């Protein structure tokens, strides 16, 4: 299915012809298809706004979605979108030139949210939370303007797992990024088709394809300390017990509300025991109980 180089989307032209890369590519495609099917992301004839930051994850997402569409396996229109947030030194020509060369429909939007973030966040604090909120609001607006039904993000399995533990350790709740949700206004879906894909696979895929990666440290902000700490914890667990990340991720798909403590998820007040067999027999007539 994926070996004919004469019938391939330009985003995957020049892919390494090694057995290792073929296996990687097929695994990522399979996991993306599984996420799309499991969470019912496809509405035939829909239009998706595929968010492209220039990082390894969003390049992987864009390539795989276009590959699926190219193969007739994703019956939706795709519009790539990059939000240039005015960060100093951002290479503004990289993405539009790349997307044009690949023949990918796209929209490049400039919004100086960087100045807002710098004005609102004290020096020494992480900018990521406010930056993300401003970016999300602009992406929703663009999606509406472009007639899109969904905003598609490049969060992968490790992002989802890290967010779960951040909420557990620091937020006091069991929650993470779901693969599919509806925005607060109720008019747009938000999809994460890379939900089942490991970060390491995204990194290797983008590196092997030699996509022009744009780092996320141009504004001088580093990733939040809490996320870095969680990542280090998970890395340690994975090193001591390979496969631990995948086991924990599967647990997020196997919740049992009756074995947790949230009365909003399970009706503990209405919980009742079933009558014992001996008690049921007391209600029977004597001749049916063998006493006549």
UniProtKB/Swiss-Prot annotation:
Pfam families, A to Z: ATP_bind_3 (PF01171)
A cellular component annotation (GO) from this entry: cytoplasm
GN (gene name): ttcA
Textual note on the cofactor: Binds 1 [4Fe-4S] cluster per subunit. The cluster is chelated by three Cys residues, the fourth Fe has a free coordination site that may bind a sulfur atom transferred from the persulfide of IscS.
Motif (PP-loop motif): 53-58
Catalytic activity annotation: cytidine(32) in tRNA + S-sulfanyl-L-cysteinyl-[cysteine desulfurase] + AH2 + ATP = 2-thiocytidine(32) in tRNA + L-cysteinyl-[cysteine desulfurase] + A + AMP + diphosphate + H(+)
Pathway this chain belongs to: tRNA modification
Protein name: tRNA-cytidine(32) 2-sulfurtransferase
InterPro entries (UniProt xref): Rossmann-like_a/b/a_fold (IPR014729), TilS/TtcA_N (IPR011063), tRNA_Cyd_32_2_STrfase (IPR012089), tRNA_thiolation_TtcA_Ctu1 (IPR035107)
UniProt-annotated location(s): Cytoplasm
UniProt cofactor(s): Mg(2+); [4Fe-4S] cluster
EC number in record: 2.8.1.-
Organism of provenance: Cereibacter sphaeroides (strain ATCC 17023 / DSM 158 / JCM 6121 / CCUG 31486 / LMG 2827 / NBRC 12203 / NCIMB 8253 / ATH 2.4.1.) (Rhodobacter sphaeroides)
CDD domains in the cross-refs: TtcA-like
Note: The thiolation reaction likely consists of two steps: a first activation step by ATP to form an adenylated intermediate of the target base of tRNA, and a second nucleophilic substitution step of the sulfur (S) atom supplied by the hydrosulfide attached to the Fe-S cluster.
């Amino acid at each position: 299915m994926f070996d004919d180089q004469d019938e391939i989307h330009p985003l995957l032209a020049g892919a390494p012809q090694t057995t290792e890369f073929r296996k990687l590519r097929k695994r990522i495609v399979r996991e993306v298809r599984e996420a799309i099917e499991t969470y019912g992301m496809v509405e035939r004839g829909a239009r998706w706004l595929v968010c492209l930051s220039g990082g390894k994850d969003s390049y992987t997402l864009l390539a795989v979605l276009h590959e699926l569409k190219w193969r007739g396996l994703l019956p939706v229109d795709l519009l790539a979108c990059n939000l240039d947030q005015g960060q100093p030194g951002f290479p503004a020509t990289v993405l539009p030139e790349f997307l044009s060369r690949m023949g990918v429909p796209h929209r490049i939007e400039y919004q100086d949210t960087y100045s807002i973030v710098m004005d609102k966040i004290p020096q020494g604090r992480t900018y990521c939370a406010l930056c993300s909120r401003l970016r999300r609001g602009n992406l929703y607006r663009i999606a509406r303007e472009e007639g899109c039904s969904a905003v598609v993000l490049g969060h992968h399995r490790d992002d989802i797992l890290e967010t779960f533990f951040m909420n557990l350790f620091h937020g006091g709740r069991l929650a993470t990024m779901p693969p599919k949700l509806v925005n607060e206004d109720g008019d747009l879906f938000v999809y994460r088709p890379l939900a089942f894909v490991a970060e390491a696979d995204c990194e290797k895929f983008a590196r092997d394809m030699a996509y022009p990666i744009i780092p996320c440290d141009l504004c001088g902000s580093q990733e939040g300390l809490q996320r870095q700490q969680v990542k280090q914890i998970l890395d340690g667990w994975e090193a001591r017990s390979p496969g631990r990340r995948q086991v924990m991720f599967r647990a997020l798909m196997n919740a049992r509300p009756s074995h947790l403590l949230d009365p909003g998820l399970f009706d503990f007040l209405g919980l009742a025991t079933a009558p014992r067999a001996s008690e049921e027999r007391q209600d029977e007539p004597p001749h049916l109980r063998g006493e006549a």
